[in-house]
Amino acid sequence: MHTSREPDRRARRNSIHAGAERRAAPDRAAALGQYRARAAVYDFEISSVEPMRRRAIERLGLSAGEVVIDAGCGTGLSLIALARAVGESGAVIGVEQSPEMIRRARDRIAAARLHNVTLVNAPGEEAEIPRTADALLFHFTHDLMQIEAAVARLMAAVRPGGRVVATGLKWAPWWMPATNLFVRAAALRSVTTLAGLDYPWRNLTPYLAGMVVEAGYGGGTYLAYGTRK
């Protein structure tokens, strides 16, 4: 007798999606489960926003010898570009709470023979950052950016005048329902709460001077940047 597991998988997915719509704050346990399931396919799933990653890294304006933090570094897709930008005299610090995701990041930097990358396997609000940073990147890290304690801890590691760049999903204006259908579908696969999608960079604003926010993808994504006060 053949028994399909697809109904069970579908039920789990539906439960995760319903939770994201109900929750007013990120859920660490749910996020760990979500990225345990996604780790093997994450690189493929996020490939459509690679141009945003490249733009965000360019916006950091990194120079040789600088230190940069990649908050929520995931499988390490940004690490090689960041490491090359700061050179052997610089340093990259990747912070990621998912063991499955950071394992892939370790494999990536080992394959690239990078010796200037340090990985910290911890939630943002508990991460021990070993050095003061010149720059900080948040690339599609919605849940992390909604946790005030995590943002505060990461910002504390950035020197005054350091550059901070964030990208991710956001709700488009109400008159763009097709874009918001895309945002909702994409968010339900990658976050544990939809709260804050109207203003995802809210927790960054107290720390940044000269903050600029640019919309993209029909208003459904953003690139925000400024300098540490």
Residues of each region from the PLM?
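Conserved class I S-adenosyl-L-methionine
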Residues: 2-61, 104, 180-183, 187
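C-terminal lobe and adjacent flexible extensions of AdoMet/dcAdoMet transferase-like proteins
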Residues: 224-229
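C-terminal alpha-helical "lid/dimerization" subdomain adjacent to the S-adenosyl-L-methionine
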Residues: 22, 165-217
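A short SAM/SAH-binding and catalytic strip from SAM-dependent methyltransferases
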Residues: 135-148
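Helix-to-beta-strand junctions that scaffold the AdoMet/dcAdoMet cofactor pocket
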Residues: 87, 145-146, 158-159
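Class I SAM-dependent methyltransferase SAM/SAH-binding core
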Residues: 69-71, 75-126
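A short glycine-rich, Lys/Arg-flanked "PGG" loop and its adjoining helix->strand segment in the class I
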Residues: 150-160
